[in-house]
Swiss-Prot record:
GO cellular component: plasma membrane
PANTHER family associated with the record: LIPOPROTEIN SIGNAL PEPTIDASE
GO biological process: proteolysis
UniProt protein name: Lipoprotein signal peptidase
Enzyme class: hydrolase
Membrane topology recorded in Swiss-Prot or TrEMBL: Multi-pass membrane protein
The keyword Aminoacyl-tRNA synthetase belongs to this UniProt entry's keyword annotation: no
UniProt gene name: lspA
Residue spans crossing the bilayer: 5-25, 62-82, 89-111, 126-146
Taxonomic lineage from the root: Bacteria, Pseudomonadati, Pseudomonadota, Alphaproteobacteria, Rickettsiales
Enzyme Commission (EC) number: 3.4.23.36
Pathway: Protein modification; lipoprotein biosynthesis (signal peptide cleavage)
Places the protein is found: Cell inner membrane
């Protein structure tokens, strides 16, 4: 139960930080325009109507389609979140859900996701992203690492405590 509370806190915290960071970036951009923060990092303004890297953004009704897809994914993740018996996985899912909700809020409010961080080196430019994107990516990576470490190695619960998993020796 404690992990569910921590997971819910992660959802709320990630969502809130994402929305605050976007509000700050929108305000900054409206006053200062694109700004170089470091030699390799700039504050920019990109309204992403598609999915990752702006794919399918030109698709007619893309916002409506991706809003429904986002809702479906969030609902599926929430079901997994509620059913999860692994405390660490619950927290990872909370981070992913919080980020997904942040981007969904943009779609509902603006009709697109607001991206504002641009990483670049010379002629190389990574597509713009936001705090929610970072949280979704990190949460998924952490979740996959947990799956590989615990489940792919045939973990067993010896104590009834989801955090006390031990690896089966073959």
């Amino acid at each position: 139960m404690k992990s569910k509370i921590v997971g819910v806190i992660a959802i709320v915290l990630v969502f809130a930080l994402d929305q605050v960071s976007k509000a700050y970036a929108i305000d900054w951009y409206s006053q200062s325009g694109a700004t170089e923060i470091f030699k390799f990092c700039s504050l920019v303004e990109v309204w992403n109507r598609g999915i990752s890297f702006g794919m399918f953004g030109a698709l007619e009704s893309s916002n409506l389609i991706f809003t429904y897809v986002s809702l479906g994914v969030i609902l599926m993740l929430f079901v997994l979140f509620v059913q999860s018996k692994c405390n660490k996985s619950t927290i990872c899912m909370g981070v992913v859900i919080g980020g997904a909700l942040g981007n969904l809020a943009d779609r509902l409010r603006f009709g697109a996701v607001y991206d504002f961080v641009s990483l670049h080196a010379g002629e190389f430019h990574w597509p713009a992203f936001n705090f929610a994107d970072v949280c979704v990516t990190c949460g998924v990576i952490c979740f996959l690492c947990l799956e590989i470490m615990y489940h792919a190695k045939a973990c067993v619960d010896t104590s009834g405590d989801p955090d006390a998993l031990s690896v089966k020796k073959y």
